[in-house]
């Protein structure tokens, strides 16, 4: 993905910002209304979701999946790089928050009463955890925003004249993955249909 020619050219950092903006705006429309910490977490979780890839020189997700067992080794390397490069620069609570955002970045999770990470079933944050004290984060929403951002990157590249077969195929696949997606009251089709 990172090596497919696109106009405008997007970097990993630019992509992360687009995902964060989408995540923030979509968080505002979640039902029931999300607590303030959930909106905060969705913004920063999306903003930092590819941070490990920045540190490991952008080994993109499809490549990781294709590597099978090596995916675990790459995840360990990403974790190691975050520890080596970020831990010395950040206060401990900030570092722990970055880990919360970047480890299993597409998992919907909370911090329980003992501040242990708890992954939630069905990627849904029940009402009883929609409070700041549980630090909820919508991993499914971030993953969806990641795909919307990729879809938009293909769309804008194609309308700007770079319409390689890979981009056209990627746009079609992403559209098909997103067209029936609904997130806590948000119909994703209404967004992507604007860019068909």
Describe every region a protein language model picked out.
Residues 1-196:
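Alpha-helical, largely C-terminal catalytic domains
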């Amino acid at each position: 993905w990172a090596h497919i020619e696109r106009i405008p050219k997007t970097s990993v950092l630019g992509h992360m910002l687009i995902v964060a903006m989408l995540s923030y705006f979509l968080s505002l429309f979640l039902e029931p209304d999300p607590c303030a910490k959930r909106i905060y977490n969705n913004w920063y979780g999306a903003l930092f979701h590819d941070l490990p890839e920045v540190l490991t020189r952008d080994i993109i997700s499809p490549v990781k999946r294709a590597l099978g067992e090596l995916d675990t080794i790459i995840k360990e390397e990403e974790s190691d790089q975050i520890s080596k490069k970020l831990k010395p620069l950040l206060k401990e609570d900030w570092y722990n928050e970055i880990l919360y955002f970047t480890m299993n970045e597409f998992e919907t999770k909370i911090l329980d009463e003992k501040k242990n990470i708890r992954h939630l079933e069905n990627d849904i944050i029940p009402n009883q955890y929609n409070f700041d004290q549980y630090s909820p984060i919508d991993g499914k929403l971030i993953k969806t925003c990641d795909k919307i951002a990729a879809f938009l990157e293909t769309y804008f590249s194609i309308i700007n004249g770079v319409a390689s077969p890979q981009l056209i195929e990627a746009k079609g696949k992403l559209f098909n993955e997103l067209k029936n997606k609904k997130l806590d009251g948000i119909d994703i089709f209404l967004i992507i249909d604007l860019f068909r």
